[in-house]
Regions:
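Short, flexible beta-strand-to-coil junctions
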Residues: 1, 6-13, 71-72, 87-93, ...
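ADP-ribose/NAD+-binding catalytic cleft of ART/PARP-like enzymes
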Residues: 1-59
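A broad, low-specificity signal marking well-ordered, structured residues that form hydrophobic/aromatic
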Residues: 2, 66, 83-85
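Short low-polarity hydrophobic stretches
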Residues: 4-5, 64, 173
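Short, isolated positions within intrinsically disordered regulatory regions of eukaryotic proteins
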Residues: 35-36, 45, 51, 72, ...
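A short, exposed loop/beta-hairpin motif centered on an aromatic-Gly-Thr core
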Residues: 57-67
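Short active-site loop/helix that positions an aromatic residue
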Residues: 68-83
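Active-site and NAD+-binding cores of ADP-ribose-processing enzymes
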Residues: 83-174
Length: 174
């Protein structure tokens, strides 16, 4: 089974692997400052770990490649400015590096979710990575005018030992 992850160009994935936030102090933190209310890298990592143990070692992925429409041109820019990598979850699991998988449903599927709830995404722990849905994602629901770029589509967060997915578990797809 695969998940798809995007990283802005240029990047060092072929040499360093995919880094979680806990392993990437050079990450652009502007989004996380707003999201967490923290003012330092260390504070952001602590905030993530308060969400649940291992959260700072999480790496987001989609069950299929991202697709843009005329209503979601920001996704087109995102895709065109990034390298897409597939993550081999079977091998990660077989080698004991996959600690947990969480599912973030579309906000459309969570009627009790309030718009002002912006502290962290809703994450539901899956029993096993084989519980990842293989149903097609409805990318047409993404709309730049509504904001929340990926809130309308389901995605996954894999918690990885050490916070790094080594290069041998990933394939550059574009």
């Amino acid at each position: 089974m695969k998940l798809y992850h995007y990283i802005a160009r240029p990047n060092t994935v072929s040499k360093d692997g995919i880094l979680s936030l806990s392993q990437n102090p050079r990450a652009d933190l502007s989004y996380y400052y707003k999201r967490t209310g923290e003012t330092t890298y260390e504070g952001i990592i602590k905030w993530f770990e308060k969400c649940f143990e291992g959260r700072s070692r999480g790496i987001r992925g989609f069950s299929e490649p991202v697709k843009w429409t005329e209503n979601s041109l920001s996704l087109k820019q995102f895709i065109e400015g990034s390298d897409m990598y597939s993550i081999d979850l079977d091998s990660l699991s077989d080698d004991g590096l996959l600690e947990a998988v969480y599912f973030s449903p579309s906000v459309m599927d969570v009627p009790t979710l309030k718009k002002e709830w912006v502290n962290d995404e809703l994450l539901i722990r899956l029993h096993d990575y084989n519980d990842i849905s293989v149903r097609p994602v409805d990318w047409a629901i993404c709309n730049d005018k509504l904001g929340w770029r990926f809130a309308f589509v389901p995605y996954y967060v894999v918690i990885v030992k050490g916070g790094i997915i080594p290069p041998k578990y990933i394939t550059k797809e574009n």
